[in-house]
């Protein structure tokens, strides 16, 4: 069930459905596509001002590249994850991976990912990696 724009994505994509048409940004999509095609690319970070469309750009690019990742494309929304300790379970949830009590969660996640070729979007990861502000928010 794919359409080039205004698509409703199938479950195999593991991406949120986009109900609006994606317009423009072909240069950015081409650059991201090129970088992800590099065999040495294990991590790609999109940076920009909040609200500039990084998430939508990542989702559109992932949807277009889906067939190049035989084990799928996944989206892990991390804005609601309150602490770094909960990062691994949040990623596992996005991957539909059930963590058991046998090994450490991080080990289970790494073992799961090790032999797979997939694209994983970690949205809002930076909020879990940055130190807390020195002053309280008002």
Language model segments and positions:
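Walker A/P-loop phosphate-binding element recognition
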Residues: 3-129, 136-138
